[in-house]
Swiss-Prot record:
Its EC number is 1.16.99.1. This is [Co(II) methylated amine-specific corrinoid protein] reductase. Keywords: 4Fe-4S, Iron, Iron-sulfur, Metal-binding, Methanogenesis, Oxidoreductase. Residues 471-500, 504-535 form the 4Fe-4S ferredoxin-type domain. It catalyses: 2 Co(II)-[methylamine-specific corrinoid protein] + AH2 + ATP + H2O = 2 Co(I)-[methylamine-specific corrinoid protein] + A + ADP + phosphate + 3 H(+); 2 Co(II)-[dimethylamine-specific corrinoid protein] + AH2 + ATP + H2O = 2 Co(I)-[dimethylamine-specific corrinoid protein] + A + ADP + phosphate + 3 H(+); 2 Co(II)-[trimethylamine-specific corrinoid protein] + AH2 + ATP + H2O = 2 Co(I)-[trimethylamine-specific corrinoid protein] + A + ADP + phosphate + 3 H(+). InterPro entries: 4Fe4S_Fe-S-bd, 4Fe4S_Fe_S_CS, Corrinoid_activation_enz, Raco-like_middle, Raco-like_middle_sf, RACo_C, RamA_corrin_act. Its cofactor is [4Fe-4S] cluster.
């Protein structure tokens, strides 16, 4: 019999097939992006609210079906499926209430009839989600949230690291599009999240990609050249070639080719450029770009996008410290999890602010959400332990969106990354806001890397990547005059207009569509023909 572990991440899904008798991982399948339109969790939530939770649920479930097909097994032999993710992803997966996550105000929730929403642990038949004929002998395990806004993924990053047992002030961050984080001071825990955006994982930048084979994940200096480091088919780091980042001259290739760059590669490139004097102030680059391989470049626009992500994380870290009442120098441990937390050079991350440069010890982990799901697959009784621990964690949640401290920090970060504001001016601005100056970066810290890759074991069947999920959303456009302005305006080539049975239809690739943060197609239409609230799923 088999078990399946599933991580519903904001930037993509990860799943593993496990032999329940031998406890061996047999195969790993990942997607190269989230199936819902948008680049962050709030985009996904907005899509579900606007278009309908049933549609969002259907897109997610169809994506999971397509991932499970990659296992090439008789799915009736799957006995257990454990699913982990943030509250929004897990609610959409289960097709349960999400409006409490969309509307923070109690009056608004009461007006909508939203009351006493609980996100407790659940064990239920897979037929409730997938129907009677699919996973017919399987039960689904969903771990609990700590609070409605502190989900199973946040619980996982606390459980799968040493975070909860540390007596000294400690910070844990799951580096991803939504950047979940928690600060522990004695028995007190403060949680938060920073909507860093997709650039932190390599999306939304010109040559960017999620961590996968061929992705540049790191760079190292060798004289005037940079050694490009890529991920191989087993997701291990491998030296590729030397390149002059200004001229693009390549030499000394080891045979590994790069096809794009991850967010961790971008962080390393920025750190190298600063050390080597190629960057004096952001976002300016020599000749307007850094060349990392044939067709692989970092532009000044990419610097701005990545800087917004790094800046959001640094601002959130500093906000947690300031609001908690401790000093920067009190922070003992910083735990880094997720793909970006695993692959990034922690020293580079410290120098740029993606990791707290004032923490005395940094420990790097991998995908803690998938790790917890795997534990629940292998040992169902582990859920009882998780529930008990979740009950004991009394966490306060700090909303960055309404925090004046965060807003002030982030304004300074934006000025630093997008306008080249000097650090001296940054400190002057902080003084005006009544905030402490930027923390000093410690020169001698302990960095411990406990994993070599995001997912330690991909299994004997290897890693399968679902690059194109292939889910299409359609809506009739009766007033369409076939000018195709919407198609030309779409920055991701996610849209096409077709005629079928005498009717014009707008077809969206759900994975490519930028969702709420874009909607250029709606704005540019001269006939106001596109009603995104009526989108429905169809096959590609």
């Amino acid at each position: 019999m088999y078990g399946i572990a599933l991580d519903l991440g904001t930037s993509g899904f990860r799943t593993q097939l496990i032999d329940l008798e031998t406890k061996e991982t047999l195969k790993t399948v990942i997607t190269m992006g989230h199936p819902l339109p948008g680049g962050n969790v709030m985009d996904h939530l907005d899509f579900a609210i606007t278009t309908g939770e049933d549609v969002a649920h259907e897109v997610i479930i169809e994506t999971i079906r397509r991932m499970f097909l990659q296992f090439d097994i008789d799915l009736s032999r799957v006995e257990r499926l454990a699913v982990c993710g943030n509250p929004i992803q897990l609610s959409l997966f289960q097709n349960t209430e999400i409006r409490d996550l969309a509307y923070a105000g109690e009056n608004k929730q009461k007006m909508l009839g939203v009351r006493n929403v609980k996100r407790d642990a659940r064990v239920f038949p897979a037929s409730e989600i997938f129907g009677e004929k699919y996973l017919s002998n399987c039960e689904i395990i969903v771990p609990p949230a700590i609070k409605h806004e502190i989900g199973a993924d946040a619980l996982a990053m606390m459980l799968e690291t040493d975070f909860l047992i540390q007596p000294e002030p400690s910070l844990v961050t799951d580096y991803g599009t939504n950047a979940e984080m928690a600060l522990k001071i004695g028995d007190r825990i403060i949680t938060a999240s920073a909507a860093a955006g997709p650039a932190i994982e390599g999306q939304g930048i010109s040559s960017g990609m999620l961590a996968s084979p061929g992705a540049i994940c790191d760079v190292k200096p060798e004289g005037q050249y940079w050694r490009i480091i890529v991920l191989d088919r087993e997701m291990e780091k491998q030296d590729a070639y030397l390149i002059d980042p200004v001229k693009g001259e390549i030499k000394d290739s080891y045979g590994f080719e790069a096809v794009g760059i991850t967010g961790t590669g971008v962080i390393s490139a920025f750190a190298m450029a600063l050390k080597g004097g190629l960057i004096e102030k952001f976002p300016k680059l020599p000749n307007g770009k850094l060349i990392l391989g044939p067709g692989i470049e970092i532009t000044e626009k990419d610097v701005e996008e990545a800087g917004k992500a790094i800046g959001a994380i640094r601002a959130a870290h500093m906000t947690l410290i300031v609001e908690s009442g401790i000093k920067y120098e009190d922070l003992e441990y910083a735990y880094m999890s997720g793909a970006s937390g695993a692959y990034v050079d922690a020293e580079d991350a410290r120098r740029l602010g993606a990791a707290p440069g004032y923490a005395k010890k940094i420990v790097q982990f991998g995908n803690t959400s998938l790790a917890l799901a795997r534990e629940l697959v292998l040992e169902k009784s582990r859920l009882d332990d998780v529930i008990e621990i979740a009950k004991k964690i009394t966490a306060d949640h700090l909303m960055m969106a309404t925090s004046e401290t965060f807003n002030n920090f982030y304004l300074c970060e934006l000025s630093y990354w997008t306008q080249g504001m000097p650090l001296e001016t940054y400190d002057q601005m902080l003084e005006l806001y009544g905030l402490p100056p930027l923390p000093k970066i410690l020169e001698h810290v302990t960095i411990e890397k406990r994993v070599s890759k995001d997912i330690e074991e991909v299994g004997s069947g290897g890693l399968s990547i679902l690059k194109e999920i292939g889910i299409i959303l359609e809506v009739p456009v009766e007033k369409c005059v076939y000018c195709k302005k919407c198609v030309k305006e779409c920055p991701e080539a996610a849209l096409e207009i077709v005629e079928r049975d005498g009717q014009r239809i707008a077809k969206y690739d759900s994975q490519k569509c930028l969702g709420t943060s874009c909607r250029r197609c709606v704005g540019v239409c001269p006939e106001d023909a596109i009603d995104i609230t009526k989108l429905k799923i169809t096959a590609k």
